[in-house]
């Protein structure tokens, strides 16, 4: 198989879909890998490392997409990449289709086999390719939030850890999943007072045990959420419904009652966000203010630390890349129910129910199409 690795073109996206180590393994397995020049440069993986591993360095994205049987990326294609789509192309990347109906339409129109990292499941039913970036984003969310709490960046001027004689800042984490637990770890490490809000009482019990009672846990309902965000200096949004648009847990009315200069970091923004006042931003223009509250809603937060993020992501994605290359997409999808869950579009048909529900489109299970 010919595997193409284009350079990411989303604003300040600096990760890369395959590392030199991955290239070496693919080439040794008899596959050909085309890497766009400088695709890995911002992840501290220069062209000469890819060449040494056996990749062919290609000068243009057009040729990478045109010649590859399967394109491996990190982020969902942006509008200027839509022209590369063609029938039968296998696209393996984060897709986050629920809030992007125009991308869905293009993938369907061109009959692309779109396999989304974020909906692949393992035998335990977890989301193994979403986990590493959720870990990075969860930990980063507190770093970013702490920075934006500084007065110079529009925040309240609060030091999260406080100092002797001055209480620490309050951090409210909405969602007790991978993002939430990693955000809580960093916030606690900085000395903040941390509250985690979740709908699942069993998860709250687990978190209480994990943190040995040192975090506050709160059952999610509108009354509790209103109170928690009103008291918070920093709110982290980390709610996920796999494949679907994130539910709006924090409403405009709740935001209007928050402290002036408080900060919101909505990590769920690539699925539409779980804060009603959140809208997607970029690393070039990351933050804005609503009702005196600073909002940081960058859709590709882990791109700020691309070396760590690329290594963490490809550790998880590469076994699937190798399986798809070795078996071909159809056979690989047929053989692995978890990989089937990752197929969002196939031969012009939408195959992911949460995306279909979010966009009001018809869908079919991919198993019925194979």
Give short role names for the model-derived ranges.
Residues 2, 8, 77-170, 298-300:
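Glycine/serine-rich phosphate-binding loop and adjoining beta1-alpha1 elements at the start
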Residues 2-106, 110:
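An N-terminal-biased, well-structured beta-alpha scaffold segment characteristic
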Residues 23, 47, 104, 142, ...:
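Generic hydrophobic/aromatic pocket-lining and core-packing "Φ" positions
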Residues 69, 75-76, 95-96, 221, ...:
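Short glycine-/small-residue-rich Rossmann-like dinucleotide-binding loops
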Residues 209-291:
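Rossmann-like adenosine-cofactor binding region
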Residues 118-159, 269, 274-370:
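Adenosine-phosphate binding glycine-rich loop
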Residues 6-45, 152-240:
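Glycine-rich phosphate/diphosphate-binding loop of Rossmann-like nucleotide-binding domains
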């Amino acid at each position: 198989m010919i595997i193409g690795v284009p350079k990411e073109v989303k604003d300040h996206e600096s990760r890369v879909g395959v590392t030199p180590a991955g290239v070496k393994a693919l080439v040794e397995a008899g596959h050909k890998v085309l890497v766009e020049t400088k695709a890995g440069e911002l992840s501290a993986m220069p062209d000469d490392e890819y060449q040494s591993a056996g990749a062919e360095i290609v000068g243009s994205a057009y040729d990478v997409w045109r010649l590859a049987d399967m394109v491996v990326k990190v982020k969902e294609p942006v509008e200027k990449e839509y022209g590369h789509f063609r029938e039968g192309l296998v696209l393996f990347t984060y897709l986050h289709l629920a809030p992007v109906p125009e991308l869905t339409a293009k993938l369907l129109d061109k009959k692309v086999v779109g396999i989304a990292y974020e909906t692949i499941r393992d035998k335990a039913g977890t989301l193994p390719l979403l986990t590493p970036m959720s870990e990075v984003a969860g930990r980063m969310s507190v770093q970013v939030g702490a920075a934006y709490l500084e007065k110079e960046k529009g925040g309240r001027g609060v030091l999260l850890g406080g100092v002797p004689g001055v209480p620490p800042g309050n951090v409210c984490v909405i969602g007790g999943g991978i993002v939430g637990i990693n955000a809580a770890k960093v916030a606690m490490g900085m000395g903040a007072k941390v509250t985690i809000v979740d709908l699942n009482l069993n998860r709250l019990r687990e978190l209480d045990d994990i943190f040995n009672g040192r975090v506050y846990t709160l059952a999610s309902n509108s009354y509790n959420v209103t109170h928690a965000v009103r008291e918070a200096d920093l709110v982290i949004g980390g709610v996920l419904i796999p494949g679907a648009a994130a539910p709006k847990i924090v409403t405009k009315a709740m935001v209007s009652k928050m402290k002036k200069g408080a900060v919101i970091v909505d990590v769920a923004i690539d699925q539409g966000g779980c804060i009603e006042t959140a809208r997607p931003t970029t690393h070039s223009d990351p933050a804005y203010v609503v009702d005196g509250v600073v909002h940081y809603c960058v859709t590709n937060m882990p791109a700020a630390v691309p070396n760590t993020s690329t290594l963490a992501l490809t550790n998880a994605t590469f076994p699937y890349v190798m399986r798809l290359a070795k078996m071909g997409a159809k056979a690989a999808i047929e053989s692995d129910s978890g990989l089937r869950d990752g197929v969002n579009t196939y031969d012009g048909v939408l195959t992911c129910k949460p995306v279909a529900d979010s966009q009001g489109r018809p869908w079919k299970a991919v198993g019925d199409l194979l």
